[in-house]
Each structure stands twice: as C-alpha cells, then as structure tokens.
Amino acid sequence: MITNKDLKRCSQQVFTYSAQYQAPFYGREKSIIEMQDKTASLKPGEVLMISQPLGTGKTFLVNHMISEEKINVPRNSNFLTAKGVDENPDLMNQFPGDILIVDEVDIKTTYKKLTGGMSNLQEYLNKSEKKAIVIGDFSLKDPKLNDCLHNQQMLTEFEQLDREFLRGVLKQRFEYFMPNYLDVDFCLEDVIDAELINYLSPEWMKTVNSFRGVFSLLQSVVNSDKYVRFNNDKAYLEISMFKEYLADDDSLDLDEEVQYEFLNVLREYLRSEFPKGAGITSGFTVDELYQLAQMGEIDTEYDDFADEILYPLAVSDLLVSTGIPTYDEDDGQFIRRPAPFVPSLKLLLSVY
C-alpha cells in the first residue's frame, strides 16, 4: 500500500517532467518506427523535423532513440539549440557524428534567433553535407521559418496524450519508481481516482495536452500538505483536491482587473455550456471569445483584446494556444500563442 508519506517522498520521480530524473520510456511505437526509418534514409543535407507542442516528449523520444542506438549520435551528447546555433555557428563543428540534433526551435526563443539559427544550420548543411534532426513546437510550421530549411521531411507519427497513453505512463512510473510499495495486484485506480485521470486527458485536448502540464499539476497537489498530509494514511488522489487547489491558487500572472473580469465570464460560460469540458470539439477563435467578452460587458476594444486579455491568460496557463506561432511583419511582434484557444486543464478543473 502506498501511503501519503511514501507518495510525497517519491512525487518528484513519479511525476517528473524534466531530465532531472531518468524516467523509463513508454509507448510511441509508431513514432519510433517512422523515426528510425526516416533517420536511416536521411541523405547529406537533409533534415528531419519534429514539430509538436512544448512538454509532449519530443526530446525524450530522441534521447531514447540515441540510447537504443537507433540514431548514430553518442549517448549523453548535449544537443544544439536554435539560439546557440544563431549566436555561435561554430558549435555545429563540435557536434559529434554526422547527424546534428538542434533542439528548442520554439516560442521560448526570439523569432530573430529562430530564423537566424535555422539559416545558419542550412548554410552549414550545404557546406558539410551532414544531416540534422530539428526539434521544435508548431513554430516550425511557420512558413518563413520553415523555408529556412530546404531539404526537409516531417515526423508525422507522434502519439498524442490520450487517456490510454496517460494511464500507461502513470502505471509504469509507479511500478518503476515505487516497486516496493505496491501490492501484488496493484492497479492505477488504487492511487488515483479514475475520474481524475479522465479529466487530465480530455479527448478534445490530446493534440496539445502535455506531460509537463499534467505532471506539474500532480506534483503541486501532492507536495501541498493541505491536500496530501505527511502521514501513513493510504494515498489517494481525488478530483476534489485539484479543484480546491486551483480555486485557492494565487499564482495567476494577471495584472489587470479586466483580465480577471473576463476570466470570470469565461469560467461561467464553460461551467454552463461545457460542464466538465463536455461538448468542446475545437478551439475558440478570437472573434468567438470577443463576442463572449461583449456579452459579459467587458470594457475592451477588439484590436486590443488578444494582446491585453487573451495573451496574458495563455501565459498564465489558463488558455492553450492551438495555432501556429508566427511573426507579424506590420507590428514587428512574434505572436507566440495565437488562436484558436482551448481551456487549459488548470482552467477546466477550476470550474469543475
């Protein structure tokens, strides 16, 4: 039996979402097969692109392929980054092997460094005739950035974080990190309410749902003594704990009253029209959300609405962008989190 004390002691490992702990690899059989085939057939100067949302396991997949010797790159190699390749192109000369791995081609990097890094990569490939694997978010689908790389192909198979995938990963994590605490007939529902698992992996969110988002939320609740006390009671995570935690969360990075006003309107709308997220099939456009703001008598102009209200909500992990980040030539801005938007798990659980 896993106690609260046991779970708190092991929460960083069981719910890890970074390279701090070496978690076992799970699933992604289709991704592995396609990636192995495409990597093996890469010709000099060609690039394999992996374009998926942040925190979904792209780098983890590549590291797994390297550790299994399915990619000809030495283990524990430090991957290049878009920023690093932009600022110091000579780093590419130092990367071991004939396949460069360039990571973090995503919204954490400025657009100028993204395009600069990819242009430098293409120039290097032209001269060296080496190959490359480029790892990034949907920024890689931006036409201007995409055009920086000439001979490219995209990894099309990348298993999404649906309910079955999440259950499999969680069960494996408990068995790997806490084997001495498990009963012989252990099942995941012994520790986590099935309804909570369902809530953390809605079908309509699987294209943008991330391990980082799910596991960081699980860590936060388990680490809080208010919801999981450091005692020998049987550990059991219920959806009510997460609802209360998010209702009490004071970490929202909102600094304008109008942002809170719209958040309240949005919460009521989701609660009444999409209880527990049921009925959501796609993201909301700026027009749809602005219409909701008008119905709620929110004082904001359409031209300011996205920048002043929607973007801060996305940064605060209340809305999740499903669009393609792009550079607005007229405004000179990198639009990192464009519409359509779907409610985040954080937002959904707060209106449960």
What are these regions (language model features)?
Residues 218-296:
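Winged-helix-like regulatory helical subdomains adjacent to P-loop NTPase cores
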Residues 92-149:
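Conserved Walker B catalytic segment
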Residues 156-197:
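Conserved small helical "lid"/interfacial subdomain of P-loop NTPases
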Residues 334-352:
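Short, amphipathic alpha-helical interaction segments positioned at domain boundaries
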Residues 44-63:
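Walker A/P-loop nucleotide-binding motif
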Residues 298-316:
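Short amphipathic alpha-helical interaction segments
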Residues 204-222:
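The conserved phosphate-sensing helix
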Residues 1-45:
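A short, basic N-terminal segment
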